[in-house]
């Protein structure tokens, strides 16, 4: 059975990422001219600090230099967090997005698209708060995971944090 370069890299790098209490979200190998590009996306419950990315990048670079996982040619290594508008693809992503606004593309004939705040997450699905339209109050909605085709966190520029709401 053949393994892809990404699978080999995942096996090699996952222990390094886990040792820093981070989750390995994605590995992407591509080309930029004559150089290879290795993009590694990591995350954690608390988010990822820039210093953690830099430290992990050094550890990964050392490990890759010890092996031939990236071949003999030159490559660029990029280690980063998933970003503010990350796609939600795993249960832990939804848990981390609790309290945030998300855009859901519904599966099948589920009426297309829904924007709602994630209030709670369990093994079967999500409890959501759908914002009211034209002065109406928000409504509660339950959404099962199998009803979701795609989901992504929405960036909110004018959201008050909890301290502001309590004041």
Curated annotation (Swiss-Prot):
The record's GO CC annotations read: cytosol
Query: Which InterPro entries does its entry note?
Result: Ribosome_maturation_RimP, RimP_C, RimP_C_sf, RimP_N, RimP_N_sf
What keywords tag this UniProt record? Cytoplasm, Ribosome biogenesis
Q: Which domain of life is it from?
A: Bacteria
Localization terms from the record = Cytoplasm
Q: Pfam families, per this entry?
A: DUF150_C, RimP_N
Any GO BP: translation
Function of this protein?
Required for maturation of 30S ribosomal subunits.
* Similarity annotation: Belongs to the RimP family.
Q: Which NCBIfam families match?
A: PRK00092.2-2 (NF000930)
Name this polypeptide is given: Ribosome maturation factor RimP
Q: Which species is listed as the source?
A: Streptomyces griseus subsp. griseus (strain JCM 4626 / CBS 651.72 / NBRC 13350 / KCC S-0626 / ISP 5235)
Give the gene symbol.
rimP
């Amino acid at each position: 059975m053949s393994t892809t370069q990404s699978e080999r890299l995942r096996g090699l790098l996952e222990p390094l990422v886990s040792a820093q209490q981070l989750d390995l979200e994605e590995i992407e190998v591509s080309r930029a001219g004559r150089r290879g590009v290795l993009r590694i996306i990591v995350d954690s419950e608390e988010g990822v600090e820039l210093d953690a990315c830099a430290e992990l990048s050094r550890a990964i670079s050392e490990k890759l230099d010890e092996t031939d996982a990236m071949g003999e040619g030159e490559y660029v290594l990029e280690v980063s967090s998933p970003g503010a508008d990350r796609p939600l693809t795993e249960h832990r992503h939804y848990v981390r997005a609790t309290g945030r606004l998300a855009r859901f593309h519904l599966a099948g004939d589920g009426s297309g698209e829904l924007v709602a705040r994630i209030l709670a997450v369990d093994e079967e699905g999500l409890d959501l708060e759908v914002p009211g339209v034209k002065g109406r109050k928000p409504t509660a909605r339950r959404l099962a995971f199998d009803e979701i085709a795609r989901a992504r966190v929405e960036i909110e520029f004018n959201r008050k944090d909890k301290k502001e709401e309590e004041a």
